[in-house]
């Protein structure tokens, strides 16, 4: 990543956003974006998308971020939660429950936080589909119609991890155990076992929302 190119990209984002940006904080890529924008002097409005609200292992992490960056992180339901509730995944279904898409969530965040532009940690290397979509918006990586920015679109995972190490930003706690963020697969056996064994209070809370979640541990692939 060439530093002058990154600076030009951030200046382009500042120009369209007025320096006021919504940014997620849940995974390693979004953390790099949060820190880059903070260092560049943007007014940040961070959010965290949850499947189950109020998990203490996650709340401790969010409180640490709030202290480090002097911000308040908005807790907001992940769009996947609407699908899980409607279709009864490890719980009773609610067939009339409305299913939301990410664009619905983004619109809700804009209304709640009072900013228009959203910066995400998505990268071209993540998938071929994402690469094709993002390359159309190079070199600024601003999707103006949707008001979405990808500041690290041309980074790779090695660069992201190196940046976080340099900035002494620890990964969320589940990375040490699972090697990835929690949000990628909230019902994967490995993740649920980790929650049950290491964070039993949070596991009990998970069961309040998804009473049959323990079945994950006994499912044979």
Show which residues each predicted segment covers.
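Nucleotide-activated chemistry modules centered on ATP-dependent adenylation/adenylyltransferase
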Residues: 1-221
């Amino acid at each position: 990543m060439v530093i002058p190119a990154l600076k030009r990209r951030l200046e382009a984002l500042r120009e369209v956003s007025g320096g006021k940006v919504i940014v997620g904080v849940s995974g390693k890529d979004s953390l790099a974006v949060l820190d880059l924008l903070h260092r560049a002097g943007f007014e940040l409005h961070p959010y965290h998308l949850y499947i189950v609200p109020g998990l203490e292992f996650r709340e401790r992490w969010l409180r640490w971020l709030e202290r480090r960056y002097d911000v308040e992180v908005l807790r907001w339901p992940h769009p996947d939660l609407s699908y899980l509730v409607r279709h009864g995944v490890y719980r009773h279904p609610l067939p009339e429950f409305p299913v939301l898409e990410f664009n619905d969530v983004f619109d809700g965040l804009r209304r709640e936080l009072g900013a228009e532009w959203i910066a995400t940690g998505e990268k071209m290397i993540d998938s071929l589909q994402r690469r094709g979509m993002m390359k159309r918006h190079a070199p600024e990586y601003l999707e103006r119609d949707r008001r979405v920015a990808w500041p690290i679109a041309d980074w790779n995972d090695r660069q992201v991890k190196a940046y976080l190490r340099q900035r002494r930003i620890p990964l969320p706690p589940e990375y040490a155990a699972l090697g990835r963020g929690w949000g990628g697969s909230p019902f994967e056996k490995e993740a649920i076992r980790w929650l049950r064994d290491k964070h039993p209070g949070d596991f009990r809370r998970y069961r309040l929302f998804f009473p049959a979640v323990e079945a994950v541990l006994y499912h044979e692939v």
